[in-house]
Regions:
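A detector for short, charged/polar N-terminal pre-domain segments
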Residues: 10-20
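N-terminal core-binding DNA-recognition domain of tyrosine recombinases/integrases
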Residues: 4-7, 24-38, 44-122
């Protein structure tokens, strides 16, 4: 997909769009980028998990770095389901990728995930 086609594909998404509908468009972008079906499934599930953590229908433009960090903290300490360091690292990558894509195509002015610290797995 050319940059022009990618920009056109996000033209229906705005700062007021909730995360879930935007994720559906992002899924096609990931596929066009040659990501494997397993990667796409995991990345989409990770971002949808963030969406389910946030207030219902939270607009993309209202998501903050603080909320993303709270989500990741909850993921590690309060979710009640173990989250391995490798899984946590992938979830951070997924969220960063999603918001970077939105920022790259002008949907959001500020990328709230840019300042989220990537946790490496050794």
């Amino acid at each position: 997909m050319s940059p022009e086609q990618s920009a056109e594909s996000v033209s229906h998404i705005s700062t007021n769009t909730p995360i879930a509908p935007a994720v559906n468009t992002w899924r096609y972008y990931l596929d066009d980028q040659g990501k494997s079906p397993h990667t796409i499934k995991a990345f989409v599930a990770d971002v949808l998990m963030l969406a389910s953590y946030l207030p219902p229908d939270r607009p993309l433009g209202d998501v903050s770095t603080h909320e993303i960090n709270n989500f990741l903290d909850w993921m590690q300490k309060n979710r009640g389901v173990p989250c391995s360091p490798k899984t946590l690292s992938r979830r951070i990558t997924s969220i960063k990728s999603f918001f970077r894509w939105l920022h790259q195509y002008g949907v959001i002015l500020v990328d709230p995930a840019e300042r989220v610290v990537q946790q490496s797995v050794i």
